[in-house]
Each structure stands twice: as C-alpha cells, then as structure tokens.
Amino acid sequence: MGRPRELEIQARLFRGDFGFEWTTHCGERLRILHFGEWNREAGPDFKNARIEFEKHGIEEGDIEVDWDARDWETHGHAVNPSFANTRLHFYVNAAGAASFARSSDHRHIPQARLFVECPPPPAGKCSSQAVSLEAARTMVDRAAKFRLETKGAAFSSASRLHGANAALFFGIAAGLGYKNNSIPFLLSAQRTGWKAAQGNDVEALLFGIAGFLEPRSFDEADDITKTYLKPLWDSWWKVRDSFSRCVLPRSIWKFSGLRPPNHPHRRIGALASVARNFPKLQKQIGESKEKGFLRFFEELDHPYWTGHWNLSADPLAKPVALVGADRATDLLLNAYLPMLGPEDAAKILRAARGPQASGILERATVWLLGCESREFLRTAWDQQGLLQLYRDFGEASSSEALEKIGGV
C-alpha cells in the first residue's frame, strides 16, 4: 500500500482519527475545538475552525493540510490571499531542512505534523511458524479488546468534534462504502455536512458531491431512471457552483470487483435513505438497542434503489434488500458498538455471529494456525480480533507476533 491520498488524510483528520491535540514544530501545544467545515471555494481545506493555542488562546480561522511541510511554499499558499486567514498548517512528511509558513500579509502560520500510518500489505508468513490453539485464543482475545477500545476512542473523538449523531452518520457512511470505497463515502457525507444531511435535498447533495450526477447519466437513462434523477438534478443545479470544489474526482472511486448490490450508486442511495430516516434509527436504537439498529437496516428501503443496481442498469425482476444482513452486521460492529461503553460493546460482540468470512479472514486463519480452520470465524469478537492481528502483524509469522505482544 502506497502513501494515502491527501483526500483520505483530510477525511480522517476531520473525523478525528488523529486526535485533537498537537504540538507545533515551534513547541507550542494546541487543541482543535472544532474543525469547522469543508471549504467549497478557493483556499485552505477547512474553513471557520476553532483552535486553542497554549500561548495565544482561542483563534478562529482556516486549516490547510498538505503532504509535505514545504508544500506551503511550493504550492504558492504564502502569496495567495485566499490562504490569508489560515491559522494552522498540517503536514505529514517533515522536510529535511527547517520549514516556515507565512501568510500573504507576512503573518507566521503555525505548523504541526500528522503521523499517518502507511502499512505495507501483509506478506502472510505462516505454516511452519504457526502458534498453538491456546496461544491463538489469547492473541485473538487481546486483539479484539484492543480493536474495540480503539474504535470506541475514535468515535468519542468524532463525537466530541461533531456531535454524536454526526459521528454515527459518518460511521455509517464509511461502513456502506466497505473497504473499497470507505473514504469516498466518508468524504461525501462530510462534505454534505450533518446539517444538510437532515434537509430535503440530502440525496441530491450526496449524489452531486459524489460526482454521480453527470449529464450523460441522465441523457442515456431509461424513463424510470430519468423520473428518479430529474428532481435530484433540479436541486443540484441550484447549488452545484457553490459545491464545485467539493465534488469528488472519479479516480477516487473503485467500481471494479464489486458485487452488483454494492455498487457505489446504490450505496449512496442507501446513505440518503439513512439520512432521511435518521429519527427512526434513533427511536429504534432507544427502544431496542442493537436489535433496533439491525431492524432499521432490515426495513430500510428506497423507491428506486431496491429495484436497481446502478443508474445505467435495467430494473431488477424483483426488489432486493437495500442493505443485506452481513452489511448490517458490519455496520453494527463498526458504527454502532463504538458508541457504547467497552463492557456493553464486548458483551454484544462476543454474542454476535460474525458476517460471512471474507478472503482476508481465511488468509488470517492460515497465518495464525498454519491451516484452514473455522475456530475463529464464528463470532464477531473472534473475527475482529483476527483482523486486527493480521493487520498489525501480518508481515511477521504468528509466532513472531506472539513474541511481540508479550507471549501467553
């Protein structure tokens, strides 16, 4: 896996994945009180952020995110008046020489480094260096507990920055994108914004920002699809100029290798339906907790998307569930459980049956035990632990991983 796109870094930063406290390269501590909003115009990535500096107190202004510390100068931000209100410059790669950021009016702009993981793909050493079943059980339990705590901390951070409802909505968006399109879905939700997601135009905004409202899609559509798209186009046309910078590039989406029900068009339709029915989701969670969450997705429908795979496909012979049982369970694990306390979440996770095992889970099992086995593929708890182990230690053998985490 190469270095992540800047868009991915920005989305994860906005969600709170990297925390909210940093130290500038001049040694001053700072705390992000609010990341503000995605910038729709020329200038920094985020507008109207609130930042509390150790020495200067609370400041309101803009935030720019770049890969390299020197990008502030090389990209011309220093002489661009659109960046004059920037209060903080984040970067990932530290320059060899000392860097300095200034605004067009010669004001010093603090810089802080983001530490972003760029893990290589697991090599999957296994077989001859596998561990015993007893050791594997301990490793999986520790990893599942760590994964649950990490996701809980991430939700707490997102909730602190954006509110619990927005954090849940963003989590559902990322989950609907699954592993192939998690970041584009998160970006679509973030750039739409939680406030707008509660409005009547949410579907038009989501499709427009995703880049899926193209003239060709409408011109080549059948009558049913044109009837569906016309009100979306009418709404998007009025605001698309103001959102032009927020529209995602087509290159960020992955369309190949997906099952038809998982096509991004259909998933964005599902996300719009979640947004429109969010009060119902809250009500069902309040009444039945995790069962209410799962029932919400079991009942979720859409007048167009339960009968279509994508905007160019023929209508389906019969309606198909908007969100299947396995995806609903995945959303439960990754969007709902992090909201709960660790003990309650662990209890549900241990009792829940895991989704159908993916290829990576099967490879992780061979990596851990040296052979194919269903031992750790039954419960959601075991699957989560197995995924975490393979993600963190897949380049080593499982016996080497056991040594790294302290043995049994």
Where would I find each of the regions flagged by the language model?
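Short, mixed-charge, low-aromatic patches
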Residues: 4-6, 125-129, 292-295
